[in-house]
Amino acid sequence: MDITQLILDDHHEQRRLFAILEQIDRSDTGTLSAVWARLGSFLELHAAAEEAIFYPALLQVGIAARRRSGVEEETLDAIGDHNDIRDAVAEAARHPVGSDGWYAAVAGANLANGDHMAEEEREGLTDFRRLAGLQQRHSLAVAFAAFEARNFAGVEPVDKDPGAYVSQAEAGTPSVGDGSLNIGGLK
């Protein structure tokens, strides 16, 4: 098991759920609502798991490999992307399911999420596979899977300040109330 593969698996599921939404009749608001509730919750759970497990580890291995600026930029961008996705999900909640405003907000979430996943797959996951050993990737995969399992009912969406997040992660100090398992130091 490898954390980068678990993240890719989650990305596939996110793409699949967005595609399902696109194929549901606009008037079937009950089904749209059910699929969107699952997807919105999953987007937040995935972001929280990455923020608790993956990004602190990416910063640590990047700093150890003397690639601090690269991994800091990737992490700052990712946390900002997670905030954009949260904001789009919150915007969708302000509109009746199936309305033009709801569809626009869902499209915004899909765009923000798609851009984030593409960058993460091209940069963060690639860097992590190059910099972290297989045992560390396995240990983090176990922690990532456990985080998602423990929080399957959802986590509270909270925007994070990207700069403060990076500073705390580099210092090994978890954010208060971030749902972290405090295992960012796994080697």
What are these regions (language model features)?
Residues M1-K187:
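Small-residue-biased structural context
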